[in-house]
C-alpha cells in the first residue's frame, strides 16, 4: 500500500481503482493488509462499486460460503447473490477417490503441498490423467516417444525429429556409444531396421531380447520416463489415450485462485508440518 500511495502522489492520477474482496483475503501471510483495504472502503472520499452478482457460485455453495463468512470478525457487509442454479454440495471421503472421481471434471483443492502429493499418488495408482498445479502430469515428449516407438514396432516409418525424441528416452543399453543423439535428418523418414543398421540402435538387449519385438515400456528406459512407466501403463489399461485432455486438476487452495470446474472437492486434511 505504501507503493500505491507513492505512485498516486507522484503520478497525480485522476482516478485510481483498487479491486478486492476482504472475505477472500487469504494472503495475509504474504503481505495482504485487510484492515487497510476495509479502511479505504469506509473512507467517504472514496467511491465503492460493489459487484453484487456471482455468475459462478450456485445457491447451495453460496449458502455455505455466506454462513462461513459471518464468522469473520472484521469484514465489510455486502450483498452478493448466487447464480440462478441450485447446484449440489456433497461431503466426500478422501479414501475412495476411484469412486468419487470416476466421471466428470474435477478440481481437487488441498490445504498443503503434502496433501497435493498424496492425492497425486492416489491418482497415479488409479491410472487417471490429471493436472497438478495447472500442468499435465504427462510430458508431451514422453507421449511423442511412446507413439513413435509403437509405430516403428509396427513396421511404419517415423520422421528423424521424432526418432531424436525416442533416443532421448534411451540409455546406452539401447543405443550404441556415439549415437546418444540421433545423427540422421529430422525431415527424413526411417524404419526400425534403418535405425539398427545405420543409427546405433542395438539389435539385441541383454543378449537375448530382440529389440524389434519389445514394447515401449521395455525399450524407453531413461531416467525421465522410467519412474512414470507404471502410471502410464495404468492410464492405457483404463482405456485412455495419453494425449486425452485431463479432466482432473489438483492444487492447493492458494495456487488455484480463480480456478473452476464442474465439480470441486475441498480436502480439509492437514499434514503434520502446519501444526
What name fits each language-model region?
Residues 91-104:
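Conserved interdomain hinge at the start of the Helicase C-terminal
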Residues 81, 98-100, 240-241:
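Short secondary-structure boundary/capping segments
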Amino acid at each position: 500500500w505504501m507503493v500505491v500511495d507513492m505512485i498516486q502522489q507522484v503520478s497525480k492520477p485522476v482516478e485510481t481503482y483498487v479491486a478486492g474482496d476482504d472475505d477472500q483475503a487469504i494472503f495475509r501471510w504474504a503481505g495482504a493488509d485487510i484492515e487497510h483495504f476495509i479502511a479505504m472502503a469506509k473512507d467517504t472520499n472514496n467511491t465503492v462499486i460493489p459487484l453484487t452478482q456471482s455468475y459462478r457460485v450456485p445457491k447451495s455453495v453460496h449458502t455455505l460460503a455466506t454462513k462461513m463468512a459471518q464468522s469473520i470478525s472484521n469484514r465489510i457487509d455486502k450483498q452478493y447473490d448466487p447464480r440462478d442454479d441450485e447446484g449440489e454440495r456433497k461431503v466426500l471421503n478422501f479414501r475412495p477417490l476411484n469412486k468419487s472421481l470416476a466421471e466428470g471434471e474435477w478440481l481437487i483443492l488441498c490445504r498443503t503441498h503434502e496433501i497435493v502429493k498424496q492425492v497425486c499418488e492416489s491418482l497415479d495408482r488409479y491410472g487417471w490423467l490429471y493436472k497438478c498445479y495447472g500442468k499435465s502430469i504427462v510430458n508431451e515428449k514422453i507421449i511423442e516417444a511412446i507413439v513413435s516407438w509403437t509405430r516403428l514396432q509396427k513396421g511404419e516409418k517415423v520422421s528423424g525429429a521424432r526418432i531424436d525424441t525416442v533416443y532421448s528416452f534411451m540409455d546406452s543399453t539401447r543405443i550404441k556409444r556415439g549415437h546418444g543423439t540421433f545423427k540422421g535428418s529430422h525431415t527424413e523418414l526411417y524404419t526400425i531396421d534403418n535405425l539398427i543398421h545405420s543409427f546405433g540402435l542395438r539389435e539385441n538387449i541383454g543378449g537375448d531380447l530382440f529389440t524389434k519385438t519389445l514394447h515401449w515400456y521395455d525399450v524407453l528406459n531413461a531416467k525421465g520416463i522410467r519412474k512414470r512407466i507404471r502410471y502410464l501403463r495404468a492410464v492405457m489399461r483404463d482405456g485412455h489415450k495419453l494425449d486425452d485432455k485431463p479432466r482432473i486438476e489438483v492444487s492447493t487452495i492458494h495456487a488455484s485462485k480463480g480456478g473452476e470446474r464442474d465439480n470441486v472437492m475441498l480436502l480439509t486434511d492437514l499434514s503434520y508440518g502446519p501444526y
